[in-house]
C-alpha cells in the first residue's frame, strides 16, 4: 500500500537510514549525467521519524522539479508546495503537470496550466496527459490515449541544474 516511508519502514521492522540515502545519491551521481530523486509524497511528507522529504532535498542540494497532479485543487497544492520550497531555501527548476486518471479532462484540469503560468515564476517544463497502460512490458504494443507521447523530449535536463 502507498504509505509514507516511516510507516512502510515500521511495517517491515526497518529503519530508514538517512546517511545511506545521501551515500547512495553520491554514488549514483558519479555514474550518470542527471540524477532524478523522487520526493515521495511531497515536500512535507515524513521521510524518517524526524525528517521530511524537504530535509532530504535541502541536504542533497538538487533543484526541484515539482510534479503536480492535474485536477481540482492543483493551483492551491502547487502554490503551497512552492511556498514551502522557497521558505526552506530550495531551488526550483520548474513544474511538470501530470494527469493521473482519465477524469483529468475536467474544466479545472484544462485551465490549470494557464492559471499556474499567471501565478508562478517557474517554467512549466511539461504537461503530461493521462497515459492508459503506460506501465506495460516494453515489448508489448502500446494502446490507449496519449500513450508514449514524449512530453520530456524537448527539455534540456542539464540546464535545469544551473
Where do the PLM segments sit?
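C-terminal lobe/tail of nucleotide-utilizing enzymes
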Residues: 83-162
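Short glycine-/polar-rich loops that comprise or flank the Walker A/P-loop
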Residues: 60-63, 91-92
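Structural motif
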Residues: 36-38, 65, 96
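Secondary-structure boundary/capping signal
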Residues: 11, 64, 123-124
Amino acid at each position: 500500500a502507498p504509505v509514507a516511508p516511516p510507516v512502510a519502514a515500521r511495517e517491515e521492522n526497518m529503519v530508514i537510514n538517512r546517511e545511506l540515502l545521501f551515500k547512495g545519491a553520491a554514488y549514483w551521481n558519479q555514474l550518470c549525467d542527471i540524477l532524478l530523486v523522487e520526493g515521495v509524497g511531497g515536500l512535507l511528507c515524513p521521510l524518517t521519524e524526524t525528517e521530511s522529504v524537504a530535509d532530504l532535498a535541502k541536504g542533497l542540494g538538487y533543484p526541484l522539479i515539482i510534479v503536480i497532479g492535474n485536477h481540482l485543487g492543483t493551483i492551491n497544492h502547487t502554490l503551497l508546495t512552492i511556498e514551502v520550497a522557497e521558505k526552506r531555501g530550495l531551488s526550483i527548476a520548474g513544474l511538470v503537470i501530470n494527469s493521473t486518471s482519465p477524469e483529468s479532462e475536467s474544466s479545472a484540469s484544462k485551465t490549470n496550466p494557464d492559471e499556474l503560468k499567471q501565478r508562478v515564476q517557474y517554467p512549466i517544463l511539461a504537461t503530461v496527459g493521462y497515459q492508459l497502460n503506460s506501465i506495460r512490458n516494453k515489448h508489448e504494443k502500446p494502446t490507449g490515449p496519449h500513450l508514449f507521447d514524449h512530453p520530456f523530449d524537448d527539455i534540456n535536463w542539464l540546464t535545469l541544474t544551473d
